[in-house]
């Protein structure tokens, strides 16, 4: 079916193949309820995450690059290893080669020196492990898919790595309510396939979906590409099972949409980055799968036109608008240079990706066509292409989703994940290009325009303290002046913990530290992360 677009668009229409249903990474899952990233599935992010040590120069140890001192935790002894082996026989990993990839973040910016990786399969095993670590004063680093951007998922020193990779079972799914209950180690992409087979979708979608775990998504309160339509995880997560620092299992794994009894304890752990407890299971509500998905990829002559295009789309598309992403021309050049992806439209200063999701293919296509005609005739858009076929939709989305991968191949990346007023979203990029000059290879901006989220990235040939000094605290102070947030969706982790004060008042920071001290008095859970050290 060819959509009835205006003549200037007709040559670029990508037409539908209604019978096509599988994404380009889909493979058969072993079993109905056991989920994980199966062998043979290509995930750019997973590939990068697990080749950083073998395929490139050794990453500098975190304490050698950052000013951080080891806290007085115990070190793992032979007796500790024997105790772990009793709890999870055959799943205590001490092989240095296997530990390498778990000690390094996928961006190759931080590296720990943990000597042991633990792979529990149940919440009870996690409880026994933490009970032992609590008594022995052993620091613990919870780890999911290790796709974090701020160094929160790898050890800083020699913390015990507690992996959720084998906790990958779907516990239940209700095909009327759409409520999914699963273990924390389920890979997001595999969960997406599981619920899609039942005519539902996950309420979040990330570029790292082929590797990231749902527990890590919740622990970092990940935003992603569906935030505009379905909101944050704070609204879609119904319940959690969490193991506290001393091994206590907190079972708040409710599947109720409404529960107004007492404090909503799960909210403490959403976005806590593993510092308050280890999430072991999640209850989440999944929206019905849209019957029709359309994507338009457009070129805009300036950022003012990007803003006006968003305003037009929001006004004319209403409830079917599910994503509105933007990127600058340097992003497009980098995905072409490093990933050989082809620009489907004429070269432009800015590009936007518009997605609609609804229940009527004809109705949605007509609405989107009217929008495209409007923005084209008004000069807001200079060129564009549209897709309704799932394969073509995935190809257009790849231009946006793989920007991070392209940047990682351009050199060392200084990454900033900021919330700003939409009208000021790109001003910081322009400002930094002038400020940094030739010291930076590229200064690029892209992100989720619909929720005011800028991903600001600066690449260089190698890590440079001079360049870091020019960026920080300048970026954070600039953001604070606009009453923005220094972390929109990536969290604070290790690298951003000391800038919390740019977004939160001292009273709020103190209260967070008191909460941490109450739930984890020995401070063994993900130390050196999320909160600034107390004086």
From Swiss-Prot:
Annotated binding of (R)-2-hydroxyglutarate, by residue: 400, 404, 415, 457, 490
Binding site for Zn(2+): 448, 455, 489
InterPro entries: FAD-bd_oxidored_4_C (IPR004113), FAD-bd_PCMH (IPR016166), FAD-bd_PCMH-like_sf (IPR036318), FAD-bd_PCMH_sub1 (IPR016167), FAD-bd_PCMH_sub2 (IPR016169), FAD-linked_Oxase-like_C (IPR016164), FAD-oxidored/transferase_4 (IPR051264), Oxid_FAD_bind_N (IPR006094)
SUPFAM superfamilies the UniProt entry points to: FAD-binding/transporter-associated domain-like, FAD-linked oxidases, C-terminal domain
Keyword vocabulary terms for this entry: FAD, Flavoprotein, Metal-binding, Mitochondrion, Oxidoreductase, Transit peptide, Zinc
Cofactor field: FAD
EC number of the protein: 1.1.99.39
UniProt KW Metal-binding keyword: yes
Binding site for (R)-malate: 400, 404, 415, 490
Transit peptide limits: 1-50
Main location: mitochondrion
PANTHER family given in the database record: D-2-HYDROXYGLUTARATE DEHYDROGENASE, MITOCHONDRIAL
Name of the protein in question: D-2-hydroxyglutarate dehydrogenase, mitochondrial
Organism: Mus musculus
Gene of this entry: D2hgdh
């Amino acid at each position: 079916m060819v959509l009835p677009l205006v003549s200037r668009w007709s040559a670029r229409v990508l037409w539908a193949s209604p019978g096509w249903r599988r994404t380009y990474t889909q493979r058969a899952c072993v079993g109905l309820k056991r989920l994980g990233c199966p062998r043979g599935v290509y995930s750019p992010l997973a590939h990068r995450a697990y080749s950083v040590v073998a395929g490139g120069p050794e990453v500098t140890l975190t304490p050698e690059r950052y000013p951080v001192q080891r806290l007085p935790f115990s070190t793992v002894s032979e007796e500790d290893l024997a105790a772990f082996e009793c709890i999870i026989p055959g799943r205590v990993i001490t092989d240095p080669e296997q530990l390498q990839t778990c000690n390094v973040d996928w961006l190759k910016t931080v590296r720990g020196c943990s000597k042991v990786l633990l792979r529990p399969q149940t919440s009870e095993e996690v409880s026994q492990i933490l009970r032992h670590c609590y008594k022995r004063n052993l620091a613990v680093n919870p780890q999911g898919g290790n796709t974090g951007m701020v160094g929160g998922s790898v050890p800083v020193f020699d913390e015990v790595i507690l992996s959720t990779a084998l906790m990958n079972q779907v516990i239940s799914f209700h095909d009327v309510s759409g409520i999914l209950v699963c273990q924390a180690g389920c890979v997001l992409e595999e969960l997406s396939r599981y619920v899609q087979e039942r005519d539902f979708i996950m309420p979040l979608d990330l570029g790292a979906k082929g590797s990231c775990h749902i527990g890590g998504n919740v622990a970092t309160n990940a935003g992603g590409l569906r935030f505009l339509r379905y909101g944050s995880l704070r609204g879609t997560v119904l319940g959690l099972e969490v193991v506290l620092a001393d091994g206590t299992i907190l079972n708040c794994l409710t599947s109720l949409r409404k529960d107004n009894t007492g404090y909503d304890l799960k909210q403490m752990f959403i976005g806590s980055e593993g510092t308050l407890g280890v999430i072991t299971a999640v209850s989440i509500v999944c929206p019905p799968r849209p019957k029709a998905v359309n994507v338009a990829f457009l070129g805009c002559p300036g950022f003012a036109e990007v803003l006006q295009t968003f305003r037009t789309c929001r006004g004319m598309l209403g409830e079917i608008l599910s994503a509105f992403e933007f990127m600058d021309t340097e992003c497009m050049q980098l995905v072409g240079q490093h990933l050989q992806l082809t620009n489907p439209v004429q070269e432009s200063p800015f590009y936007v990706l518009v997605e609609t999701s609804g229940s009527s293919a004809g109705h949605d296509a007509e609405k989107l066509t009217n929008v495209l005609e409007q923005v084209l005739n008004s000069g807001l858009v200079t060129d564009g292409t549209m897709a309704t076929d799932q394969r073509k939709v995935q190809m257009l989305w790849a231009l946006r989703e793989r920007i991070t991968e392209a940047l990682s191949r351009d050199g060392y990346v200084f990454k900033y994940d900021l919330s700003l007023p939409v009208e000021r979203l790109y001003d910081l990029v322009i400002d930094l290009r002038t400020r940094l000059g030739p010291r930076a290879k590229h200064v690029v901006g892209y992100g989720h325009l619909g929720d005011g989220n800028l991903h600001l990235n600066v690449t260089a040939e190698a890590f440079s303290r001079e360049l870091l000094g020019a960026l920080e605290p300048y970026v954070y102070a600039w953001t604070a002046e606009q009453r923005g947030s220094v972390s929109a969706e990536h969290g604070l982790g290790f690298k951003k913990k000391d800038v919390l004060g740019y977004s939160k008042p001292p009273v709020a920071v103190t209260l967070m530290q008191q909460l941490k001290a109450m739930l984890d008095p020995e401070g063994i859970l993900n130390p050196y992360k999320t909160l600034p050290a107390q004086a």
